[in-house]
């Protein structure tokens, strides 16, 4: 952009939201679980592997911001994007408290189990405040700017790393 004579400008607001006033709602929820024979491992097995990885990296939790990684971990699929079978959500996995999907509960309801909680993304700062001295692993290069600002403002200790599920997937 700069080489072509353009200018980069940082905006704190989503410019699309400011212009797209008649944006259609998401399609009706169509979440489902992948059968274990297709998924390869259960959520419990994947969670145990993730907890061991985080422990080895001296982290208490990880914020998963890759939609494909969250869907893979939970063995779920959905209809939130045309031609891409995913549920749009992030996840916070804590070694002690388990998995919390950060998204719309009504859309995620079909895949929820007793070992999965769900909260709106707006509750993330409060959840991070409860971490104490535990370190949060984040994939800084893929973290939305607004979310990064909220994490930094929460005072939680962070550890930057690639998504721990990328190789496993």
Model-derived regions, located:
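Compact, glycine/acidic-enriched structural inserts
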Residues: 105-117
């Amino acid at each position: 952009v700069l080489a072509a004579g353009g200018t980069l400008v940082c905006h704190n607001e989503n410019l699309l939201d400011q212009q797209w006033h008649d944006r259609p709602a998401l399609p009706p929820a169509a979440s489902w679980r992948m059968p274990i024979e297709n998924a390869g491992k259960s959520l419990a097995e994947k969670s145990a592997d993730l907890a061991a990885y985080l422990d080895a990296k001296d982290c208490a939790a990880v914020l998963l911001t890759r939609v494909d990684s969250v869907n893979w971990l939970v063995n779920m699929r959905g209809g939130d994007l045309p031609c891409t079978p995913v549920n749009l959500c992030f996840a916070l996995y804590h070694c002690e408290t388990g998995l919390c999907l950060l998204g719309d509960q009504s859309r995620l309801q079909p895949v929820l189990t007793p070992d999965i909680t769900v909260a709106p993304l707006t509750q993330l700062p409060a959840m991070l405040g409860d971490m104490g001295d535990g370190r949060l692993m984040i994939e800084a290069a893929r973290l939305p700017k607004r979310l990064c600002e909220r994490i930094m403002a929460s005072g939680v200790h962070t550890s930057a790393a690639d998504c721990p599920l990328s190789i496993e997937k």
